[in-house]
Amino acid sequence: MPGATEKGSELSERIESFVEALKRGGGQRSSEDMARETLGLLRRIITDHRWSNAGELMELIRREGRRMMAAQPSETTVGNMVRRVLKIIREEYGRLHGRSDESDQQESLHKLLTSGGLSEDFSFHYAQLQSNIVEAINELLVELEGTTENIAAQALEHIHSNEVIMTIGLSRTVEAFLREAARKRKFHVIVAECAPFCQGHEMAVNLSKAGIETTVMTDAAIFAVMSRVNKVIIGTKTILANGALRAVTGTHTLALAAKHHSTPLIVCAPMFKLSPQFPNEEDSFHKFVAPEEVLPFTEGDILDKVGCHCPVFDYVPPELITLFISNIGGNAPSYIYRLMSELYHPEDHVL
């Protein structure tokens, strides 16, 4: 079957190019682009590969998922999408297998903790399983397209006239959130520049083009200005399993200053950023880049006397966060474990 061979080789090339892009840091892709591309590839794997039952398919998805995740462990969105697809396979198989919705209800925390060791039999063959899974993935892709709009639609509930809002760095989700609020409310945004990458400057330009009164300041001035701020609104790279954040460097400083002044800290993040990871997973948590922006090579005399590290992310503990705003509404950090059980199966937390 030359057609099938061509399709297989084309899919392999697409997966290879995606893996190579991940190894290089993902290029200019946003987390949403990563999620969409991962889902597209997984959908192609499901339709193009040969498999006879849900068990074989899940093993295939796990294998390809591990390969993608190994290319860039800090890009948690890829692993999250793999886990979502595994959950979809389990649900569609359960429906065809005759399991009732009542028995598939999300279990209590106690049951989730004590359910280890029980594994389901996925060896039965169902002809319509593939079409059902693909349809569910298509629905998930449609949901992904509307995540930013759904978060932005909640802006007027949280931002009021004449407020002073502080944010840090560049977040497309926060930008859309503030732009939506600015259509009906007048407020002032202070953007911390997020050195050494200084993405806050781009954020400030984008907001000022939208007619929002914007001020850029250095990260060192965060604490001094915080007493004037009504709310802190930030984005994040990942929401961890304990309700903490893995966000751009400087976010922890901002969160501590907000806590000291009892200023509410709101995190705008879509559900695909929710990860079953914990902060002690070293490989996937930390990411360091060249410290050239901090200590340029022109400082020749000092270079051999100093070891310089430039981390990309900060860890922000859950007790510093007031509210998460996602595409399904607002939730407290303590509710994250519940959302986790709705999105991912406990057996898929470690692929």
UniProtKB/Swiss-Prot annotation:
Enumerate the subcellular locations listed in this protein's record, separating them with semicolons: Cytoplasm, Cytosol
Provide any one GO MF term from the record: GTP binding
Q: Where is the signal peptide?
A: none
Biological process according to GO: central nervous system development; cytoplasmic translational initiation; myelination; oligodendrocyte development; ovarian follicle development; T cell receptor signaling pathway; translational initiation
Out of the domains of life, which is the source? Eukaryota
Q: Does the keyword Zinc-finger apply?
A: no
Q: In the UniProt record, which is one GO cellular component term?
A: eukaryotic translation initiation factor 2B complex
Explain the regulation of its activity: Activated by the chemical integrated stress response (ISR) inhibitor ISRIB which stimulates guanine nucleotide exchange factor activity for both phosphorylated and unphosphorylated eIF2.
Query: Where mainly found?
Result: cytoplasm
Against SUPFAM superfamilies, the record matches this protein to: NagB/RpiA/CoA transferase-like (SSF100950)
Q: Which UniProt keywords apply?
A: Cytoplasm, Initiation factor, Protein biosynthesis
Q: Does the keyword Oxidoreductase apply?
A: no
Function according to Swiss-Prot or TrEMBL: Acts as a component of the translation initiation factor 2B (eIF2B) complex, which catalyzes the exchange of GDP for GTP on eukaryotic initiation factor 2 (eIF2) gamma subunit. Its guanine nucleotide exchange factor activity is repressed when bound to eIF2 complex phosphorylated on the alpha subunit, thereby limiting the amount of methionyl-initiator methionine tRNA available to the ribosome and consequently global translation is repressed.
The similarity comment for this entry is: Belongs to the eIF-2B alpha/beta/delta subunits family.
Q: Cite the record's note on assembly.
A: Component of the translation initiation factor 2B (eIF2B) complex which is a heterodecamer of two sets of five different subunits: alpha, beta, gamma, delta and epsilon. Subunits alpha, beta and delta comprise a regulatory subcomplex and subunits epsilon and gamma comprise a catalytic subcomplex. Within the complex, the hexameric regulatory complex resides at the center, with the two heterodimeric catalytic subcomplexes bound on opposite sides.
Protein name per the record? Translation initiation factor eIF2B subunit beta
